[in-house]
Amino acid sequence: MSKILVFGHQNPDSDAIGSSYAFAYLAREAYGLDTEVVALGEPNEETAFVLDYFGVAAPRVITSAKAEGAEQVILTDHNEFQQSVADIAEVEVYGVVDHHRVANFETASPLYMRLEPVGSASSIVYRMFKEHGVEVPKEIAGLMLSGLISDTLLLKSPTTHPTDKVIAPELAELAGVNLEEYGLAMLKAGTNLASKSAEELIDIDAKTFELNGNNVRVAQVNTVDIAEVLERQAEIEAAIEKAIADNGYSDFVLMITDIINSNSEILAIGSNMDKVEAAFNFVLENNHAFLAGAVSRKKQVVPQLTASFSA
């Protein structure tokens, strides 16, 4: 029997990689499964900081599960097929651990599925460690903590669940770090955008959502200076136009998120700008508009777009 591949979504972030490492370890220890962690893309700068800090090698990148000889896979931090490996429909999904909406997901066989509306997939995996009485190694605790910090912007995002505020200090202690100091350093590591091309910038953390027959790409970049990113607007818009043409997106929505002040600027291009404007009750000027208090794609952008595109 081949190894069960464990991986997060395309354009992996710290939670996608952290939760997959953690669950692969738990699956071996608690369930006796033969698992291997892989990824659907290279780590971003934030995640590279995390892996280096805790001395963990980056997972190898795959583009096909079947090409790896895999018959079964476990998904963490996602379930929608368009966000997963290209041939996901051709292998058996053994299990899913996720904290997002369920959409465009169907399996031929029963599976193990753990879904909770918490701040990160890592939060769920940590609870499973405790349920099974499995000791958490320091580096695994660090990866799960990093996934939680990343997805909740150090517990400031509205996606933060009350249990996340309990879990974070526990994981910080297990990882041997100061929660606030490490969290801020980690988040700042992911805001170095100057070295990124516009094409790289709009793909750092991007997901495609099928909204009422429209393929809508929603990307997010974190920064400490929104104005600095907007100085590159012409370059970014050219990259977005190319991405739309190359991939058949109907619309492209980019969140430029200020992690210090917890606000975002929305830059949007596509065929349904009236629906984007209606979603957030704003008017786009020169293709962008300010969205006060918005830091979460999952809670403050995608549900609003979903409702607007369905109206």
From Swiss-Prot:
For the ligand (Mn(2+) 2), the binding residues are 15, 77, 99, 151
The EC number of this protein is: 3.6.1.1
The record's SUPFAM superfamilies line, in alphabetical order, gives:
DHH phosphoesterases
Xref: Pfam families: DHH, DHHA2
- Which keywords are on file for this protein? Cytoplasm, Hydrolase, Manganese, Metal-binding
- Extract one GO molecular function annotation from the record: inorganic diphosphate phosphatase activity
The record's InterPro entries line, in alphabetical order, gives:
DDH_dom, DHH_sf, DHHA2, DHHA2_dom_sf, Mn-dep_inorganic_PyrPase, Oligoribo/pAp-PDE_c-di-AMP_PDE
UniProt enzyme class:
hydrolase
The cross-references to NCBIfam families, in alphabetical order and at most eight, read: PRK05427.1
The protein in question is named Probable manganese-dependent inorganic pyrophosphatase
Chain's gene name: ppaC
